[in-house]
Swiss-Prot record:
UniProt cross-references to InterPro entries, sorted A to Z: UPF0145_dom_sf, UPF0145_YbjQ-like
Chain ranges passing through the membrane: none
Family indicated by similarity: Belongs to the UPF0145 family.
Domain of life of the native organism: Bacteria
Record protein name field: UPF0145 protein RB3016
Family matches, as Pfam families: YbjQ_1
Length: 112
């Protein structure tokens, strides 16, 4: 399913708006990953394990949002936004939102 953070598709015409859609995921962090991240913060560099959790969570939120868009009869989602927050001391919540739409490919102008 085509998805974009913009409010339009350059290559598609939006025929109908089906409504807002959301995807939510919550991931727990483990102690070893926390210790590794603290060490990375002190030494410098990237916390690869946390980045993997963020990517997995973001992809899961997008997949959930895509399924909800399909349930509304949509074939695309526009205006996607993400929100990240912590729940308690060891949980990460990732929420995505967007607008489900029916979008059809633009037909190229034959005169050009």
């Amino acid at each position: 399913m085509p998805m974009t953070t913009t409010s339009t598709f350059e290559t598609h015409i939006i025929e109908a708006y089906r409504g807002p859609v959301f995807g939510e995921t919550i991931y727990g962090a483990n102690v070893l990953r926390d210790i590794s991240a603290v060490f990375t913060d002190v030494v410098g560099g990237r916390a690869g394990d946390y980045e993997k959790v963020l990517i997995r969570g973001r992809n899961a939120a997008l997949a959930e949002m895509s399924e909800r868009a399909k349930q509304l009869g949509a074939n695309a989602v526009i205006g996607i936004r993400f929100d990240y927050s912590t729940v308690g001391r060891s949980m990460l919540m990732i929420c995505s939102s967007g607008t489900a739409v029916i979008a059809n490919p633009r037909i190229p102008d034959a005169s050009h």
